[in-house]
């Protein structure tokens, strides 16, 4: 979650601490100014190089390429935008910084000139902070919000034709200063709205809700208001209208309002009020007039319609009233499901869209193309556009799936067809059609009724050998074709990715279909051969028959293939949530790895037992699994992670399928190394562990921490089943010795473990000796680098909380302690005088912080505040 959506944090209590906090952040902002200056100078240099290049190109070539000119122009505009953005950020930091410097006497030369000693300056600063404490806290805390707001660039005032996602093209701005809303109902005071409107008159975006006009008087009041707006002659970038299509007065008001608008670029018409069926017979002519007004608007560049499907025929009928010769329309989107419309109207609909001379983006929700003429008209339309988003729910049986995709740069294609329609030959023709689009950069395919064939174990092994041989020869100029493929069953899958690997410009590819071994093997080919692929996503359907283990799909080769990727980000997932695999590329040397495995996936264990990830470039890994069957699987998981030698961040969430039988019994697995294997990760800085623990596993964590001196953040979360009588002494002693430790988070909930009355006192003594006393010693004696201690425990006994508060109050260095919110509330309400005195002492020292306060150098824990977990 971005900073702008977070609750305002609160600084620690205590005037001296508040002063230190403000001064420390001031130094951070000063360093940011220098950073922005450097970045600004670099961008200026790049901008000058680009200008020089363009001038040389113009001098040397009288007939230079228009595309090159456009690319250079776009780059220059982007650089200029970034330079201006950095200027604004520098000015913002300077403005706040200079005010704080002046008010807090931070100018040493000025202090010497006025004869102020360091002690006098400190006293004056404390007095100022005490008098206006909230003011200076807010100055510091609001800086991140303002910088984030500036970094986002506000709303997009100009949209380029090259934008891929047509849905995003229609998004309304969220900048409160630049859009205004009108509500047409009986309670609206249009006089007040007009007064406010004329005072500002600088809105870029207009939102209108026409849903509650019940009487003619209300209609005429809104109509008079519409005609008054017409006199202002204002222009808008976006007009967003929400209308009730079940109300005739609202439909008429929509027409009158559209006629009152002189100039706007993007129009969204939708209906938040829906019903199962509409009867538009009485107002059909009115709807035709509305569509004629919309499509005849001379300034309109984008139209997004989300209207009832019953209005579709009136849209087609209105085409005879529309002259498109001078139309500026570039982007068109119809996001209503049209499965039940008259199929005879569809061919006229595509023919109507063909006539717009500047149309480049077409997005169409589910529509039946069951007539041959409709398919032919669709192909003619596809010849004109560069970006197409189509969902086809029916295709003529005689059509051979020969589409015209040659000119497309962006294609999102979904098929909702009967399995028998999409035959092997038709699928082959479709992929050959896509293959012809040499400039295609974005491709998304969804075959949600595609039925795959079963694959035998023998065939799997044979194809695995084929792919391995292919990978070994990938550096040759041409990859040899395999000769030993099994015949007909593998053809559709293998050819599928073979065709796509020839799309040399393809950067973003996503596919959703039924998975077979052939599809996985051909996926390997695609990843090996595609030189420009930057993003790949596979969502597959997988159903294993328990009685037929020979249908098992082997995932072994995919990890080996992905290990060799240098540029591509990969996402592989199952719709049922069985597996989700992500490898995110930041640049050529930084990757982020995320793997989620759930218990229904039978081959999860092979991921850890048979393969090591060995991603040499991976620096951040998050692995979540609820499918591990034994402690050996956890050990294998640790081994796989330890093979990523450059890891800096690790987040592990590992649970077992059947943990109940080992809850109260020792695991007794001395031969397993568990987390001790992390000793190999010499660059590891941040660790988060959430898995079942026994003393052996807990000791393995301590052993690897002893060898890894770069650890900055250590997070140990509670697993829902805990072992009794664990000793945390060694763990806290090891953490105490880490020289760069900045953050510790402990969530073990020991108080929730219950014992019989006979053993209660023994258990209480053990908790004090093996957990609370080592924790308090750690708090007292930790290194100066430790900033935050997160103690997330719902309930703590009075004796234990006293020891913790005493430790943080008497600690050798200044640390911050954050308690569980419920625990904090109970402490405030406590009638124990000793606890209240300790709380007061901690407040004066400024060591207790609220749950939602954010420390810039600390990682999110996901417990108190909703930060983006992808920071791991």
Swiss-Prot record:
A GO term, aspect molecular function: RNA-directed DNA polymerase activity
Region annotated Disordered, chain positions: 55-75, 471-492
Basic and acidic residues compositional bias, start-end: 474-486
GO cellular component annotations of the record: chromosome, telomeric region; nucleus
Reactions listed under catalytic activity: DNA(n) + a 2'-deoxyribonucleoside 5'-triphosphate = DNA(n+1) + diphosphate
Domain of life where this protein originates: Eukaryota
EC nos: 2.7.7.49
Alphabetical keyword list: Chromosome, DNA-binding, Nucleotidyltransferase, Nucleus, RNA-directed DNA polymerase, Telomere, Transferase
Subcellular location: Nucleus; Chromosome, Telomere
Subunit structure: Telomerase consist of two subunit, p80 and p95 that form a 1:1:1 complex with the 159 nt telomerase RNA.
Functional description taken from the UniProt entry: Ribonucleoprotein DNA polymerase that catalyzes the de novo synthesis of telomeric simple sequence repeats. Subunit p95 contains some or all of the template-independent primer DNA-binding site termed the anchor site.
Protein's name according to its UniProt entry: Telomerase component p95
Species of the source: Tetrahymena thermophila
């Amino acid at each position: 979650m971005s900073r702008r959506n977070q609750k305002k944090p609160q600084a620690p209590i205590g005037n001296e601490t508040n002063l230190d906090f403000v001064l420390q952040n001031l130094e951070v902002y000063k360093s940011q100014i220098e950073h922005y200056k450097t970045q600004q100078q670099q961008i200026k240099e790049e901008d000058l190089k680009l200008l020089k290049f363009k001038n040389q190109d113009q001098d040397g070539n009288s007939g230079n390429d228009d595309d090159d000119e456009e690319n250079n122009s776009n780059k220059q505009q982007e650089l200029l935008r970034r330079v201006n953005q950095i200027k604004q950020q520098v000015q913002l930091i300077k403005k706040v910084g200079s005010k704080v410097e002046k008010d807090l006497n931070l100018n040493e030369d000025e202090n010497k000139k006025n004869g102020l000693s360091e002690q006098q300056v400190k006293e004056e600063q404390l007095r100022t902070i005490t008098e206006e404490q909230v003011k200076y806290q807010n100055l510091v805390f609001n800086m991140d919000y303002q910088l984030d707001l500036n970094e986002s660039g506000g709303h997009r005032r100009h949209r380029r034709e090259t934008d891929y996602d047509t849905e995003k093209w229609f998004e309304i701005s969220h900048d409160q200063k630049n859009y205004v809303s009108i509500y047409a109902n009986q309670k609206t005071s249009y006089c007040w709205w007009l007064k406010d409107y004329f005072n500002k008159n600088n809105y870029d975006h207009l939102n209108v809700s026409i849903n509650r006009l019940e009487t003619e008087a209300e209609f005429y009041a809104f109509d008079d208001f519409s005609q008054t707006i017409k006199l202002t002659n204002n222009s808008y970038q976006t007009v967003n209208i929400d209308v009730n299509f079940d109300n005739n007065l609202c439909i008429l008001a929509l027409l009158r309002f559209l006629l009152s608008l002189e100039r706007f670029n993007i129009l969204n018409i939708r209906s938040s009020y829906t019903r199962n069926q509409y009867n538009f017979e009485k107002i059909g002519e009115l709807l035709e007039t509305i569509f004629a007004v919309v499509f005849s608007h001379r300034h309109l560049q984008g139209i997004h319609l989300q209207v009832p499907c019953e209005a579709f025929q009136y849209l087609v009928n209105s085409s005879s009233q529309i002259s498109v010769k001078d139309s500026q329309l570039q982007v068109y989107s119809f996001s209503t499901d049209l499965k039940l419309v008259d199929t005879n109207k569809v061919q006229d609909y595509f023919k109507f869209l063909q006539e717009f001379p500047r149309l480049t983006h077409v997005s169409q929700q589910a529509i039946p193309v069951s007539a041959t003429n409709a398919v032919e008209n669709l192909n003619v339309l596809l010849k004109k556009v560069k970006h197409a988003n189509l969902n086809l729910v029916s295709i003529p049986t005689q059509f051979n799936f020969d589409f015209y995709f040659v000119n497309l740069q962006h294609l999102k294609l979904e098929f909702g067809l009967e399995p028998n329609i999409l035959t092997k030959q038709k699928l082959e023709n479709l992929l050959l059609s896509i293959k012809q689009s040499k400039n295609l950069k974005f491709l998304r395919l969804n075959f949600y009724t595609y039925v795959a064939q079963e694959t035998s174990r023998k065939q799997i092994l044979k194809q695995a050998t084929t792919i391995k041989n292919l990978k070994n020869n990938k550096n040759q100029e041409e990859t040899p074709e395999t000769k030993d493929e099994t015949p007909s069953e593998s053809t559709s899958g293998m050819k599928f990715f073979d065709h796509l690997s020839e799309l040399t410009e393809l950067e973003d590819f996503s596919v959703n279909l039924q998975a077979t071994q052939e599809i996985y093997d051909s996926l390997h080919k695609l990843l090996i051969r595609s030189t420009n692929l930057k993003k790949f996503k596979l969502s597959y359907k997988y159903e294993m028959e328990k009685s037929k283990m020979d249908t098992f799909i082997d995932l072994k080769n995919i990890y080996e293939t992905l290990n060799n990727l240098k540029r591509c980000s990969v996402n592989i997932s199952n719709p049922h949530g069985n597996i989700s695999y992500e490898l995110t590329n930041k640049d050529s040397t930084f990757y982020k790895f995320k793997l989620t495995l759930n218990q229904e996936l039978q081959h999860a264990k092979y991921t850890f037992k048979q393969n090591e990830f060995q991603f040499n470039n991976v620096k951040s890994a998050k692995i979540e699994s609820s499918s591990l069957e034994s402690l050996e699987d956890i050990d294998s998981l640790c081994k796989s992670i330890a093979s990523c030698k450059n890891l800096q961040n690790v987040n592990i969430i590992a649970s077992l399928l059947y943990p109940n039988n080992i809850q109260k019994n020792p695991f007794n697995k001395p031969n397993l190394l568990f987390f001790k294997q992390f000793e190999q990760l010499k660059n590891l800085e941040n660790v988060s562990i959430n898995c079942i623990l026994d003393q052996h596993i807990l000791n393995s964590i301590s052993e690897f921490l002893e060898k890894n001196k770069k650890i900055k953040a250590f997070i140990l979360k509670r697993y829902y089943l805990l072992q009794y009588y664990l000793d945390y002494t060694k763990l806290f002693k090891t953490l105490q010795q880490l020289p760069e430790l900045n953050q510790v988070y402990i969530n073990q909930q020991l108080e929730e473990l219950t014992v019989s009355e006979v053993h209660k006192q023994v258990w209480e003594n053990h908790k004090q000796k093996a957990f609370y006393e080592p924790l308090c010693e750690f708090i007292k004696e930790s290194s100066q680098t430790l900033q935050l201690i997160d103690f997330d425990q719902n309930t703590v006994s009075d004796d234990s909380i006293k020891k913790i508060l005493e430790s943080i109050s008497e600690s050798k260095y200044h640390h911050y302690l954050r308690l569980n919110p419920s625990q904090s509330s109970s402490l405030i309400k406590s009638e124990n005088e000793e606890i209240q005195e300790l709380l007061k002492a901690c407040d004066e020292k400024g060591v207790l912080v609220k749950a939602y306060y954010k420390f810039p150098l600390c990682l999110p824990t996901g417990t108190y505040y909703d930060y983006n977990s992808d920071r791991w």
